[in-house]
Amino acid sequence: MIETATDVETSPSPLVSAHPAWSCRWCSSQHGVRVLDAGLQSPSDLHPRPSDPAPDPEYPLVMVMCLDCHLVQLESDPTTPEEPRGLEPSALVEQAEAAIKDAEADGYLRPGMRVLEYPSPHGGSWVEQLGRRSLVEVSEGPADLLVDIFGMMHDADQRAALTSRVSQMSPDAILLMQFHTVAAIVRTGFWNALRHGHFAYYSTPVLVRMAAELGLTAITAREYPLYGGTIVLALAKTGSRWGDQGEGVTSLIESEIADGVLEPEAVASLNDSLARSAAGLKRYVSEAKSRSETVAGYSAASRASALIRCGGVTAHDLVAVADASVGLHGRTMPGSRIPIVSPDDLVSARPDKVLLFVPDLLNEVRQALPEIEQNGGRWVLLDPMPREIDSTVSD
């Protein structure tokens, strides 16, 4: 029998030291503790074909906090790097537009500036929008503006990654780093932000300190609602014309420290979030099944795989998971082998409930698939507990 998070007690447990072979991805310290253990999980971008041999490969998925620099990070990752999956959610496009407008208002954008972008496999690129403002994309420095959109977290060697970015900056350059802050991850119980291929999880105080070690000063920080709390931090070389650390940065640092982002015990509350959300998912689909309701899912993202695995949900519970990426159609979710289908196939199935594994997609999918609610179905957000959304269709 596979143990699932539904079997796990939610009472606090003593923190366990990181694996003896672990060393910090920033400071090389070997003093760390495990703050989240998601058990065995498949690689983040694995979507096997129905005919592929089973069982699917699984590896430990563990989050560690360094006790010296407090960087939250992936303990180990034997998987291969993930690859982009194509379609870009509108939530990421909207986030890019909002952040670019703010960067423009802060004086960081000028026509003719040389821009170097460090993208991630998840989309959210700023290149097109910056091009419309007459900024010039380059493939190497020195650059006047460097943009990192959830990019550096994919680098196993964090010090080398940030050092490389600093080396590409002109004397008065700005480095804009967008990241899903640990404060939001803990506050919202977003434990399944943890995944193979995501080597680092930043809090604002830790990232500001990392940057300072390499001669950078945090000038401004802006917060956005994406993923429950996304930060865009503006960094400049210390002593440049941009001046000292901004008051907004200092205020955000103080706020996040008060939230406990430097305290392993506070971050370890994610284990309770995992247990509650996994149990809640299993209970929800079991109750729906007892009412003879058809339940499906939407978004074959890695966070969905982790939640399905921890909840012990199978193809007997979910008839399918729909995804807009054509390359995933005909494949399955790892471990559970739940079929991945097209949005059109989801509509044809006429599900009573559709579990939305990425809540930020709600407005987008409701607009794209009005038939779900028109046919009497309901969207159910997993954020992280199941929450049914009232239908927009009038009786």
What role is predicted for each listed range?
Residues 124-127, 284-366, 375:
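A solvent-exposed beta-alpha-beta segment
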Residues 2-3, 7-94, 222:
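N-terminal juxtadomain amphipathic helix
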Residues 160-174, 370:
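A short glycine-rich, Lys/Arg-flanked "PGG" loop and its adjoining helix->strand segment in the class I
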Residues 46, 177-200, 204-206:
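Short, glycine-/aromatic-enriched active-site segment of Class I SAM-dependent methyltransferases
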